[in-house]
């Protein structure tokens, strides 16, 4: 299947640069995955499409302030480090710019020495394995010295970093936000619960591979990045009960979808408490075992994310919906509007 099948024209001015003041005031396109029919709503009206006994599955990962600015200990040369993935203990997979002169043995200093690192290894795609040393707790030091790593297509500075977190973010570890969840407010979640709709949480730590373009013509040859996920016993029990009682499982975001499908594939369509790494790549032809509905933002052309939603709703339905979204001036990408596919 050719990557160009997932291309579409997107005017640059439709790429949202800032979040709306009211999270739930985003627009919501409701897409019927059977017929392709489209309705236009406000996001807070998503509740009218959810039924008692359904379950929304949210990714409770929290974005790290993963961008660090420092210098090489020997020369004082400036470096920028982006934390990608914790390997074990204080060893991290990172991107370093400029990276050519950061080789195994190179020492880096951040915040006047509050945080230090040594390069242990070089990786493909310009990656580096760094081992950090510090006083106290790593994430406290990171909160003091690090900056929020916004996606490359967002050019404007974010006034309030919490707007790039969901209101329910708690498990720190992501290099990017699970953006479908950015539209929910505490008030909307309370109203959803009061209607008898279950809310369950999984964790998937989003890596920057989310933004890595597909660089092969044939998508079957694309290798997905691996990301850490976990599901609790409480969430597994809720989901199995909802499924047994005939309720719908509605994933909030492609990250929740990939977690749910990974686990359902491993347990014959059921859910179980577990943690691990997933590199599942979902594209048309995939048979879904876990989800009945999907809340998602509008994605980049030729991205693995538009391939996933095309697998769920049909490529022609999705490309038509995106054509309508452009015509109707929907806002795209991380700070943009949302789509509900049911």
Curated annotation (Swiss-Prot):
Keywords: Cytoplasm, Queuosine biosynthesis, S-adenosyl-L-methionine, Transferase. Signal peptide: none annotated. It catalyses: 7-aminomethyl-7-carbaguanosine(34) in tRNA + S-adenosyl-L-methionine = epoxyqueuosine(34) in tRNA + adenine + L-methionine + 2 H(+). Pathway: tRNA modification; tRNA-queuosine biosynthesis. Its EC number is 2.4.99.17. Monomer. Transfers and isomerizes the ribose moiety from AdoMet to the 7-aminomethyl group of 7-deazaguanine (preQ1-tRNA) to give epoxyqueuosine (oQ-tRNA). Belongs to the QueA family. This is S-adenosylmethionine:tRNA ribosyltransferase-isomerase. It comes from Geobacillus thermodenitrificans (strain NG80-2). The gene is queA.
């Amino acid at each position: 299947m050719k990557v160009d099948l997932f291309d579409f024209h997107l005017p640059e001015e439709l790429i949202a640069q800032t979040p709306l003041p009211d999270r739930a005031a985003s627009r919501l396109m409701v897409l019927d995955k059977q017929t392709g029919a489209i309705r236009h709503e406000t996001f807070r009206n998503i509740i009218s499409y959810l039924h008692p006994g359904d379950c929304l599955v949210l990714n409770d990962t929290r974005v790290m302030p993963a961008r660090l600015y420092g210098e090489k200990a020997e020369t004082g040369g400036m470096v920028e480090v982006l934390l990608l993935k914790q390997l074990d203990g204080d060893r991290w997979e990172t991107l370093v710019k400029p990276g050519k002169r950061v080789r195994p043995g190179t020492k880096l200093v951040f915040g006047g020495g509050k945080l230090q690192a040594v390069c242990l290894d070089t990786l493909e795609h310009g990656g580096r394995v760094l081992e950090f040393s510090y006083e106290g707790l790593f994430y406290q030091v990171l909160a003091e010295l690090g900056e929020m790593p916004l996606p490359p297509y967002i050019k404007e500075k974010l006034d309030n970093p919490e707007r790039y977190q969901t209101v329910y973010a708690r498990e720190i570890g992501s290099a990017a936000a699970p953006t479908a969840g950015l539209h929910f407010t505490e008030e909307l979640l309370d109203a959803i619960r009061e209607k008898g709709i279950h809310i369950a949480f999984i964790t998937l730590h989003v890596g920057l591979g989310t933004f890595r373009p597909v660089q092969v013509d044939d998508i079957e040859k694309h290798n997905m990045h691996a990301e850490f996920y976990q599901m609790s016993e409480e969430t597994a029990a809720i989901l199995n009960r909802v499924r047994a009682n005939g309720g719908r499982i509605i994933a909030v975001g492609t990250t929740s979808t990939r977690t749910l499908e990974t686990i359902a594939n491993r347990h014959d369509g059921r859910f179980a408490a577990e943690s691990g790494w997933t590199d599942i790549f979902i594209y048309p032809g995939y048979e879904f075992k876990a989800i009945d509905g999907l809340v998602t933002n509008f994605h980049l052309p030729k991205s693995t994310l538009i391939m996933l939603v095309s697998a769920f709703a049909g490529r022609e339905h999705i490309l038509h919906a995106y054509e309508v979204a452009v015509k109707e001036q929907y806002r795209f990408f991380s700070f943009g509007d949302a789509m509900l596919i049911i």
